[in-house]
From Swiss-Prot:
UniProt signal peptide: none
Note, other: Displays a superantigen activity in human and mouse, activating mostly V-beta-8 subtypes of T-cell receptor.
Identification of the protein by name: Nucleoprotein
UniProt subcellular location: Virion; Host cytoplasm
Family in the record: Belongs to the lyssavirus nucleocapsid protein family.
Length: 450
């Protein structure tokens, strides 16, 4: 008997077949650099910076920016942002800089140039006759890179969220050490005329390069990061959610994974912790792998690890976290089962803590406390034990263990308890649910059961 086949009759004829479904045909690409070469892009001929500044500023005032010219200018302007490397800087075996080296953003990457001239038109007229200052260059670079952040804000954000962000960014780039170079609302107007900057590979690459530089190098103009910070851990929402989750419940990654009682987690956990990646290395190329073009399909996105993502946010919903209630459910990754496990884990970690005295008036008090704790431990070890050791976790006061939670789930037949459902309904019904969000899912799924 073939376990994969089913047998049935069609017009009195016995049919035996193996049901096969569509599987994910896309290969996830890991970002590790194997050839020891820095990330690279190719741009047109390097411009005269004064001419380029006037052209790009003119285009911004007219809300008509040429993406190729913008990228060429941003790459050339990197020379204005020299800083000192605080420590030897290596990533994936590549030496980026030594401690004490003077570096600029283009020290992190390779930017090749062709002989193709840019347009450098004066779309918005010619207003500036003198050469721009470094502060003016810095302001223009900051405003241009902020188009990346604005284009990453999804349409789900209601009201004037994007306009308010744009206004705050403009205020930053008209305050010292920057200088005002555009009229109010110019940034938002420019964004509306071309809203897809985050999809332009070269622009995304330059935004990631600037962000990687300013995140490590102390600099007068570090506030430029306000527009590029969204390139850090881009398309890593699954991994970022897991990191936030373990901090929230105060466990190590290893301890947390022991609570993941579902076979569908196996492939996702293997994918998230693939050896050879620099997920835990500060200032690695890994942090900006998406913008630097090191991976076309991220293995760390919410879709790539959808069961993990769903579970984490169901636990977050149980704990009443707005971020989780607003997050989008990955519908193809067993949300009903994940909501059950999320209820039990939410109950396990919600409203409980592990506490102990850590600070004392003097050394004598510390020693007395440690001696008393040692005595308690000795007494516990000497207990003749009225409970079988296998059942210890479940029946003793120590319920915060994977074994105890798993036992509770099995004793309830893999179903949520009424108290779990009431909690889910309570947090989701008091929240204005966005379409396809966890709040909407919980409301629709459990409100009739409460």
């Amino acid at each position: 008997m073939d376990a994969d086949k089913i047998v049935f009759k069609v017009n009195n004829r016995v049919v035996s077949l193996k049901p096969e479904i569509i599987v994910d045909q896309y290969e996830y690409k890991y970002p590790a650099i194997k050839d020891l070469k820095k990330p690279c892009i190719t741009l047109g001929k390097a411009p005269d910076l004064n001419k380029a500044y006037k052209s790009v500023l003119s285009g911004m005032n007219a809300a008509k920016l040429d993406p190729d010219d913008v990228c060429s200018y941003l790459a050339a302007a990197m020379q204005f942002f020299e800083g000192t490397c605080p420590e030897d800087w290596t990533s994936y075996g590549i030496l980026i800089a030594r401690k004490g080296d003077k570096i600029t953003p283009d020290s992190l990457v390779e930017i090749k140039r062709t002989d193709v001239e840019g347009n450098w038109a004066l779309t918005g007229g010619m207003e500036l006759t003198r050469d721009p200052t470094v502060s003016e260059h810095a302001s223009l670079v900051g405003l241009l890179l902020s188009l990346y952040r604005l284009s990453k804000i999804s349409g789900q954000n209601t009201g004037n969220y994007k306009t308010n962000i744009a206004d705050r960014i403009e205020q930053i780039f008209e305050t010292a050490p920057f200088v005002k170079i555009v009229e109010h609302h110019t940034l938002m107007t420019t964004h509306k005329m071309c809203a897809n900057w985050s999809t332009i590979p070269n622009f995304r690459f330059l935004a990631g390069t600037y962000d990687m530089f300013f995140s490590r190098i102390e600099h007068l103009y570090s506030a430029i990061r306000v527009g590029t910070v969204v390139t850090a851990y881009e398309d890593c929402s699954g991994l970022v959610s897991f990191t936030g989750f373990i901090k929230q419940i105060n466990l190590t990654a290893r301890e947390a994974i022991l609570y993941f009682f579902h076979k569908n987690f196996e492939e996702e956990i293997r994918r998230m912790f693939e050896p050879g990646q620099e997920t835990a290395v500060p200032h690695s190329y890994f942090i900006h792998f998406r913008s630097l073009g090191l991976s076309g399909k991220s293995p760390y996105s919410s879709n790539a690890v959808g069961h993990v993502f769903n579970l984490i946010h169901f636990v977050g919903c149980y704990m009443g976290q707005v971020r989780s209630l607003n997050a989008t459910v990955i519908a193809a990754c067993a949300p009903h089962e994940m909501s059950v496990l999320g209820g039990y884990l939410g109950e396990e970690f919600f409203g409980k803590g592990t506490f102990e005295r850590r600070f004392f008036r003097d050394e004598k008090e510390l020693q007395e406390y440690e001696a008393a704790e040692l005595t308690k431990t000795d007494v516990a070890l000497a207990d003749d034990g009225t409970v079988n050791s296998d059942d210890e976790d479940y029946f003793s006061g120590e319920t915060r263990s994977p074994e105890a939670v798993y036992t509770r789930i099995m004793m309830n037949g893999g179903r949520l308890k009424r108290s779990h459902i009431r909690r889910y309904v309570s947090v989701s019904s008091n929240h204005q649910a966005r379409p396809n969000s966890f709040a909407e899912f919980l409301n629709k799924t459990y409100s009739s059961d409460s």
